[in-house]
């Protein structure tokens, strides 16, 4: 090969590689374009974690996360494909492009931020005090003289200990099942537990008329987006912001959690 031809080959190779990288970048940013082109979005949701996601008596998925997924699809004007995931495979579903979004009680932490991106928060995930609607309970002071069931060593146990008055009779149980059983059977008047446990308990025991009473600790949920997909993330953030402003997200949280969304981080 002549020396004169080598610079031209080098330039051609450089241009080719640049085109490849630009194509890859365009592909990485095209998730929203793909959704709009096919008029359908694939969203991963939980089906084993009430009240955020579970299978109803009609065998259809329902819950806060499911309703949020449907809200996003409706705002985009596209059909929706719901894909059930577990805690273990929800992030890999984003990484392998099996889902455009993951709406599955995702908390944000540094390790997850290395591999996926997050939208603004869309709902709270919390530990709280629950009791029948007929129980007068508006402040921690109202726990005085009441029996309160809690799972030993759980986050709600630690948070309850911080606020419970000395006269509250706190009864600790070894696991969530025992705590719930004690409350349902009337051994305790009040229960301190996580939103998911409470949601499942309320769904199974509607006759108790249980409702949210006091917040112990709040940990918001975020929607997962593939790493670097800023276009889709920005669009979903627009939808979340509008839904928060209109009260739609508060309505979803009241429906499934018994409380409004409250202050959520952007």
What spans do the regions from the language model cover?
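Short helix-initiation/N-cap motifs at beta->coil->alpha
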Residues: 66, 81-92, 171-181, 185, ...
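Ligand-binding clefts/hinges and TM-proximal coupling segments of bilobed small-molecule sensing domains
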Residues: 29-30, 155-172, 210-212, 241-266
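A ligand-binding cleft/hinge motif common to bilobed small-molecule-binding domains
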Residues: 89-92, 106-114, 159-162, 184, ...
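Extracytoplasmic small-molecule ligand-binding "clamshell" domains
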Residues: 29-105, 246
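Acidic, polar ligand-binding/catalytic clefts
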Residues: 70, 74, 79-142, 209-210, ...
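Extended ligand-binding regions for polar small-molecule ligands
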Residues: 66-75, 141, 146-147, 152-155, ...
